[in-house]
Amino acid sequence: PVHSAEGYLARLIKGGCRVAIAEQTETPEEAKKRGGSKALVARDIVRFVTAGTLTEEALLEPRRANVLAAICEVRGTCGIAACDISTGRMELEECPPERLGAALARLGASEVVAPDGWDASPADCIPRPVSTFSSDGGEARLKAVHGVATLDGFGQFSRAMLAAAGGLIAYLDHVGRGRLPLLLPPVVLGQSAHLAMDEATRASLEILRSEERRVGKECLRLCR
C-alpha cells in the first residue's frame, strides 16, 4: 500500500537494498484508447531509491548529513566527489591513494560509487561504468548542470576531481531516471584544512556513532 511505502523503504534501505519505484505512466482512459477495454495501464520505473539518494525526511537522520560519494583514480591521484542531495551541497577533493580510506571515513558516506573493476575501490562500493568517470565528461556534466560555459568561476579542479564529479552526476542521473536533484556549485576542499583520521580512530573516539551500550552519547551530540 502507498501509505506504508516509507516503512518498507526504511527496512529495505537499512538492509542494504536498492529499491526501484514504479508508477503508472498513463491513465485508464489513455490505456483504453491505446489497446481497448482490456489493455493494462502502462507502468514504468520512475526512480531508484538508494542509501545515498534518500530525500524522504522520515528516512533521514536529522543530525547527520546523508552523503553520496564517487571515487576514482586518475594518474596516481584519487578524486572524490561528495554531495548531500537534501541540501545540494557538493564537495570535490583529491588525495594520494594511501589516504583514500581516511578521506572516506571523514565523509561517512551512506553510499559510495566507483569505476567497475577498479582494484583499489572499497569492497562495499557500487560499481559503475568506467566511461562515466572521464575527466572531460565530468567537466561537461558540471557545465551542463550549472548552465555555464566555463568552470573558472567555481574554482580550480584537477582531472581527478572532474572525473569523480562526472561519475557522481552520472549516477544521480541514473537513479533519478534523467531527473537530477538541485546541485549547488562545487566547493574544493583543501587537504590542509582537515585533520585526517582513519576509520578505526573515528570509531574508538565515538565522534559520529556511539557503541550500542551508549546509544545517543556520540561526542558531537554531547557537545552541541
Give the location of each predicted region.
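Charged catalytic and DNA/RNA-contacting regions of genome-maintenance
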Residues: 1-217, 224
